[in-house]
Amino acid sequence: MERTGRKRRAISWYRGGPPFTKTLGAAIAEIASMLIKGKCHCGNIAFSLTWEPEPAEIPARACTCSFCTKHGGVWTSNPRGALEVVVKDPRLVSKYAFGTRTAEFHICARCGIVPIVTSQIDDHLYAVVSVNAFEGLDQSRLRRASAGFDGEGEESRLARRKRNWIANVTYVESGT
C-alpha cells in the first residue's frame, strides 16, 4: 500500500466478487452494530435485536391494517440483523393470525402486549419487532411513517417480507 499525503489506511475485502478496497473507518462503520432490547410489559416475551450496521435512524412503520390500528402496532426490521426471542412461559403466548393468515402476532396472554410478529416462508422464520416494546432506546432515532398493505396479493406480501423482515431469527421457549 502506497502512503502519500494524508491518505487513510485501507483494507482489502473479498465478498464473492472481485476484491475491493475500503478505508478503515468505512469498514468499521459497516461492521459496527447496535443491540436493541425489547419485551412485553411483564417480560414474558423478550427480544434482542442486533442491528448491523448501526443505524443513524430506525424505520418505524405504523401499519394501517385493522388489527395494528386497534393495537397501536408500529414495526421495524432489518434484513441484515439478528433477532433472538426468549419466551419464559409459552403457555402465556397467544398467536393470532387473520386476513391472509401468513403472519402470526405473538401476544402475551398476561399483559396483552404484541412485541413480535413472525411469518413462516418457505420453511424459514422471518420477523418484525414492535418499536413500542423497545427498552431504553432514544425515541428520536425512530423515523415513523405509515405503511398500508391492504390489497397486496399473498405472493407480493411474502416476497416483501423475505426482502425486508429479519431473516436471522432464533425463537427460544425457556419454560418456567
Regions found by a protein language model. Give the residues of each.
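Residue-identity detector for glycine
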Residues: 5, 16-17, 25
